[in-house]
Amino acid sequence: MPQISPNAPLEGNVSPPPTQPHLDDNLHNGNGNGNGIHSSSSNINKHGSNINGNNDSNRSSPAKSPKRPVSSSFRIQNTSRYDNDEEDLAASEQVAGGDRQVPDYWQQRNGATTGATSGRQSRAISPGYLDNMSENSEQPPVVPLVRSKSRPEISSAAASRYNNLSYWKARRVVFYRNGDPFFPGVELRYRPGRDVTSLDNLLDKISPKMDLPRGARYVFSMDGDRKYHLDELEDGAFYVVSSFKAFKPASYGKKNGMWYASPGNQGWGSKPASRKPSIMEADLGTLSTTSGSIKRSAGRVIRIINNLDHSVQCRVLLNLRTSQPFEEVLEDLGQVLKINGAKKMYTGTGQEVRSFSQLRNEFADVDTFYLATGTALIAGSPIRRSRSRPSVVAAAPILPTDELPKVPLRGARPRSKSRPRILYAPESEILRPNGEYTMLDIMKEEPTKVTIRGLRRTFYPPVHHAPADNSPPDKKLQLQWVHGYRGIDARRNLWVLPSGELLYYVAAVAVLFDRDEDAQRHYTGHTEDIMCMDVHPSRELVASGQKAGRDRKSQAHVRIWSTESLQTLYVFGMGELDSGVTAVAFSQLNGGSYILAVDSGRESILSVWQWQWGHLLGKVATLQEGLSGAAFHPLDDNLIITHGRGHLAFWHRRKDGFFERTDIVKQPSRSHVTSVQFEPDGDVITADSDGFITIYSVDSDGAYFVRTEFEAHNKGIGCLIMLGEGTLLSGGEKDRKIAAWDSLQNYKKIADTKLPEAAGGVRTIYPQRPGRNDGNIYVGTTRNNILEGSLQRRFTQVVFGHGRQLWGLAAHPDDELYATAGHDKHVALWRKNKLIWTIQTGYECVALAFHPFGTLAAGSTEGHLLVINCENGAVMLTLRVCGSPLNCVAYNQVGDMIAMGSQNGSIYLFRVSRDGFSYKKVNKIRGSQPLTHLDWSMDGNFVQTVTIDFDLLFWDAKSLSPERSPIAMKDVKWLTNNCTVGFLVAGQWSNRYYSTTNTIVATCSRSAAHDMLASGDAEGYLRLFRYPCISPRAEFHESKVYSGMLACVRFLCGDHTLITVGGTDASLMVWDIVEE
């Protein structure tokens, strides 16, 4: 049985070395635990910031790390994170300006610090630390180093490092993804000690580029040798990066027997040179005609405008060296502007352009040209101007009408009234509030290009929109209420605190619900879903363990926090726990001084900690799949019981930290031990998935035997709880029964009761008043509800939650009401914190919409439309629209038309009566891609939708046809902005401030005042931007309380409240929007 000895140096207990030579040895040691703590003075002067070496990456263990004496393991602890951004320097100076005395930078570099500052902390057991509300730190927060103004003399020990100048040379390293032979590799060029200060720092840089399930944590050579230190990486070498410790051999860098070319270089697979194209769409974010990157003789970026419709225009890169005739180029340009047979090009002053040489020479300073089929330029009317203001520059210079020959406009196509000409803008829309934003500025605004799932999409700016502000909004989100309960996949997750509050968890939030005051408090220290929880014997502290996220900053760990102050007291397991925490439990006999944690990784490592001191007492790999729980024996703090699928074992911890295992259930066994309780004399009570309760006793030789076994329920038992008077309560998951058994009379049944079918099976039972024998209990169910009652009276609902995936959400247009619907076939109406009604419809509803007069429409996965009366929840009408799911539903502004987007890609339009209860099918507009979001235009003439591939499509509701030109639709005003793509919401994609790359925005909502944008992504992040949100530099306020996808977000009437739904446990959360 693989075991890990705990006899390793503990964090904070390493003393500083007695003499300077030990420090000199350490500076020359290649160990990555303290790597990258030196930097040349020129680098410090250049960046103006301190250097930080992240304290170890790669999760080194004592068994694999080089063994050295404690003195040689001494490390200077670096404290300030290296960054090229100048704002980090200001932040460092602000912290350093406090009351704490900070040693000089060069003194710390040369080992002149003493005490805990210079003590190397062991990463072998990754002991805990005070949290200090820092979610992403792997070490205790310390004050950044401050560089002194005058540089002292460098000691000989530190200066000796500079003798090897090759160490500071730039290195080029290529990394491959573990187990993926087709991954082309990520190339990184860096200077050790400057660009990259430690192996941890290097892994942080490449994690966003590797798309690993838990981020980059381990580095291996191509032969599988693990690299622990930055010094081990050689220039020009190739390495493999993994989230886990297991290396997978593969032909990295090869495909079909040929090596890939190095990233950034052309290899054998490069495409042959092709004929130079005459025109191509210009990437305005990277091309500049004035920067000298493209010579005038080679090509030009120009703006071309349709002479017949000035709102149709485009920026193109024109190749002046093409072999095509000028006339063919004009025809190609005409196709871009939807002009058939374009033959003429004019400047804004009416001069005709006849050749490429004129574009290079005579019209070199002209950037705007008009294309026409006739012989002259058609002038538009000038912009209306106020007499009290100076003239505003027009979008393009136009010839006076009397100087142009009159040309008949037979070829001019009719224009829609919803597409205003850009030259007829009113004065109020021409100027920004500061009076300096003219129409010329609008014309210079370039289309936005966004890359989504590897495909580039272009969104065109409307002529009139509010000014973009990239600063974060002046309001923030504050969690106000959490609806629901995690009973669908969790056990032992409901308690009653001494204050009378109910304690349970939903998503990444621990909820403390006071029924008497009708109020909630929330502990939000976790960044991913909570997987397990336990209450300290004092009932004043709580330990909760979370799962691991996709990045390295959301690692699995356990947090111990106070129920009174909601402050984090201790965190442990960072870097030690793999993919999550299966179980956590406090010891009982010694008053909760010990705590155990079981890792949900492949080895299911059991570890025991003395949490007040941060000591790891021991750990062992159980190697048990399907392990679901663990607990200390109440009469022996060194005896631990683990249970799970086909597993029940006792672990006795010896004084040396090793564990002795005794298996009670012999392998193989199909039974799943679901719960464990104890009799007052120490005998063990277990419940299993077959409905049996078993009592184990110990004989005089210390061996365990089955004393009693009986069938308590038809099928699986969800939980057991032993009350103080010796009564055992058991709850069935399948038969929904709760039974009471008298342990003093050989477990004779006292009474039983059955929960309603709508409530679900029993997941957890807890007495309402612990210590009292009144029989009142709380019950958590498998359908995410909490009930209260007793075996003598009926159960009533305390907390309602949707039992399966929750997708549908709609906000009432004129009231603080909102409705939810999910795959559990329930539709519910809420008023902020209160449930008004809930109905079971018989259909899995995924889309909701409110009629302007209060009717609720619900679209189902079977293609039905349900019309519900909001007064009483009665279903008034059921229509079969199609055979595919209705993913999005919306009424137009006046409520006389409803549009439904289907999984088959079509839009279905129905005429609606004034009261919203009568519907008549108008027609459908065929499409090809599944639709996910939908918005109506303000005038009710158009609909915009988003496909499953994030394409933005437009539909003409009057002509019942798709609108093919996104440029023609750029000035349409939309009633809502629920579509996740578009010019005014492009800043929520590929934002530079996101912690992860390739973020997929799943939902968004615009406030009624058009000043805020709420956005939710597939990783569970909720963000609040200013609206419009155009630039990828737009800043935001962020919260993360979901691990799964945030399915839908909506503002309530008045813009004071935000509602979110989603996650893996169908959680519903209410957020207050407060001043920052």
UniProtKB/Swiss-Prot annotation:
It holds the Pfam family Beta-prop_EML_2. Residues 70-81, 107-124 have a biased composition (Polar residues). Belongs to the WD repeat EMAP family. WD repeats lie at residues 525-571, 576-621, 623-661, 668-706, 712-751, 801-840, 842-878, 881-920, 926-965, 996-1035, 1041-1076. GO terms for biological process: adult locomotory behavior; cellular response to mechanical stimulus; intracellular signal transduction; melanotic encapsulation of foreign target; microtubule cytoskeleton organization; sensory perception of sound. Its main location: cytoplasm. May modify the assembly dynamics of microtubules, such that microtubules are slightly longer, but more dynamic. GO terms for molecular function: microtubule binding; microtubule stabilizing activity. One of its GO terms (cellular component) is microtubule. Residues 1-143 are annotated as: Disordered. This is Echinoderm microtubule-associated protein-like CG42247. Keywords: Cytoplasm, Cytoskeleton, Microtubule, Repeat, WD repeat. Signal peptide: none annotated. InterPro entries: Beta-prop_EML-like_2nd (IPR055442), Beta-prop_EML_1st (IPR055439), Doublecortin_dom (IPR003533), Doublecortin_dom_sf (IPR036572), HELP (IPR005108), Quinoprotein_ADH-like_sf (IPR011047), WD40/YVTN_repeat-like_dom_sf (IPR015943), WD40_repeat_dom_sf (IPR036322). Residues 171-253, 300-384 form the Doublecortin domain. Residues 36-55 have a biased composition (Low complexity). PANTHER family: ECHINODERM MICROTUBULE-ASSOCIATED PROTEIN-LIKE CG42247, WD-40 REPEAT PROTEIN. It is found in: Cytoplasm, Cytoskeleton.
